[in-house]
Amino acid sequence: MKFVFASFALFVIFLCFSQSLSQSYFRCRDNEVFDNCISNCGPPRCSNILNTYPCTNLGPLCTPGCKCKDGRVYDNQGRCVLQTECFQK
């Protein structure tokens, strides 16, 4: 029983440690947040938010990294802006 408990405790510690390492590896910019699973189809951008075609990327389903906060997309300069700002030019 002690072995099972010790194994479980080590597993939990490993999960916590690996999560903190992956978050510290990425330095997210203004209006970005870290996410463990970002779609490999690419982030939403001003240039593709109206695209109605589904992504057909056959690679891994997701990767860790930074993404725009809710309601924001990347503009042409790579900054996270509100979606409404995409159409103001």
Swiss-Prot record:
Keyword annotations: Disulfide bond, Protease inhibitor, Secreted, Serine protease inhibitor, Signal
Example of a GO MF term: serine-type endopeptidase inhibitor activity
Similarity section: Belongs to the serine protease inhibitor-like (TIL domain-containing) family.
Tissue expression from the record: Expressed by the venom gland.
Main location class: secreted
Function: Serine protease inhibitor.
One CC-aspect GO term: extracellular region
Protein name: Venom peptide BmKAPI
Disulfide bonds: C28-C66, C37-C62, C41-C55, C46-C86, C68-C80
Residue intervals of the TIL domain: 28-86
Organism lineage string: Eukaryota, Metazoa, Ecdysozoa, Arthropoda, Chelicerata
Domain of life: Eukaryota
Signal peptide location: 1-22
